[in-house]
């Protein structure tokens, strides 16, 4: 894709001078204007008018596509992104992808046809290669999940390290049989967290029973039912590592309703009621506000200067918040 820097090189001027020509700066000489116009024609370059309007302070719109706005993690992230962009005079078009991969392409392409100035997206499918032609003309940043089949800019959290810390924490409190509950491996966050779980199980010499790994469906309620079945079986798990917030909420409710108050649990992702429950829920905090803020920064860099080098991969640290549920000792046999 031809950029402003390419035009500057062919015209023999700086990128700043090219920008001044685009913005009709009266202090640029006619000779310089002609050289820039000649270079544009030679390279078949069309100025990014959306970026121009953004710099001029005009209203522009950014698309934000997430799996589920009801998920507390994505809800907090969405609020952060909206506040940040609207404070800069930019509207935000929010859409939900759901958890079915077939819906993702339809929703994103419908959004991109609206000629938005940029897109922030947390994908749900296993292949984003269909976005390649769109990315040529619309800046994109991938959030929470790295794109697959496409080279793109993405901002994620340390899923691997967070899962390792969660399981290690349970191991330090005496647990040997730790169950993993998550969603489909189609989601890259689940894949990385499962790898972190397995790494910690091996490192701490825990029981590597395959029956302790459960990914029944996208439904947290089904995960809760499967957990209760495992707790009723011989040699049940004494602790649970939950892969995401909806799953954690369903598992905690099921444990309470079934009277399994001695089962330890650590969830990946914080949520509003986590500290108010009894016992309060130990979590791996993902910092959704920080993720959203950096995603906005990366997107604005790409909008302002499409040819600029932007850091492609950003991984934010996570932190364990001990509150009680992850510190319960194993129940006596």
Q: Across the structure, where does each feature detected by a protein language model lie?
A:
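Bacterial carbohydrate/catabolite-sensing allosteric modules
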Residues: 1, 10, 42, 83-88, ...
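N-terminal helix-turn-helix DNA-binding module of bacterial transcription factors
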Residues: 1-60, 330
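Short beta-strand segments enriched in small/hydrophobic residues
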Residues: 17-20, 54-70, 169, 177-184
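Amphipathic helical "hinge" segments at domain boundaries
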Residues: 45-110, 114-117, 195-198, 202, ...
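Short hydrophobic/charged patches on amphipathic alpha-helices used for structural packing
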Residues: 51, 105-108, 132, 167, ...
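Short beta->alpha connector loops
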Residues: 98-101, 122-127, 245-246
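Acidic, Gly/Pro-rich loop/turn segments at junctions of secondary structure
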Residues: 118-130, 142-151
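Catalytic-core regions built around general acid/base machinery
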Residues: 129-137
């Amino acid at each position: 894709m031809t950029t402003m820097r390419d035009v500057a090189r062919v015209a023999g001027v700086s990128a700043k001078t090219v920008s001044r020509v685009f913005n009709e700066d009266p202090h640029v000489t006619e000779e310089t204007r002609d050289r820039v116009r000649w270079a544009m024609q030679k390279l078949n370059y069309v100025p990014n008018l959306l970026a121009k309007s953004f710099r001029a302070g005009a209203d522009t719109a950014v698309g934000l596509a997430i799996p589920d706005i009801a998920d507390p993690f994505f809800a907090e992230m969405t609020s952060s992104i909206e506040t940040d962009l609207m404070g800069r005079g930019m509207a935000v078009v929010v859409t939900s992808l759901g958890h079915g991969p077939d819906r993702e392409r339809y929703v994103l392409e419908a959004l991109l046809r609206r000629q938005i100035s940029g897109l922030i997206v947390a994908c749900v499918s296993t292949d984003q290669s269909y976005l390649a032609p769109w990315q040529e003309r619309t800046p994109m940043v991938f959030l929470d999940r790295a794109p697959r089949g496409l080279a793109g800019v993405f901002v994620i959290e340390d899923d691997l390290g967070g899962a390792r810390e969660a399981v290690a924490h349970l191991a330090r409190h005496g647990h040997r049989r730790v169950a993993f509950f998550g969603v489909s491996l189609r989601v890259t966050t689940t894949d990385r967290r499962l790898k972190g779980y397995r790494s910690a199980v091996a490192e701490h010499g825990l029981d590597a029973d395959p029956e302790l790994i459960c990914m029944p469906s996208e439904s947290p309620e089904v995960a809760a039912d499967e957990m209760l079945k495992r707790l009723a079986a011989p040699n049940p798990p004494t602790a649970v590592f939950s892969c995401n917030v909806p799953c954690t909420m369903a598992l905690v409710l099921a444990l309470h309703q079934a009277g399994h108050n001695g089962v330890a649990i650590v969830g990946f992702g914080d949520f509003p009621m986590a500290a108010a429950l009894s016992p309060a829920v130990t979590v791996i905090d993902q910092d959704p506000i920080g993720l959203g803020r950096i995603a906005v920064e990366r997107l604005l860099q790409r909008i302002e200067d499409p040819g600029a080098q932007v850091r492609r991969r950003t991984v934010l640290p996570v932190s364990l918040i001990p509150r009680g549920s992850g510190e319960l000792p194993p129940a006596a046999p």
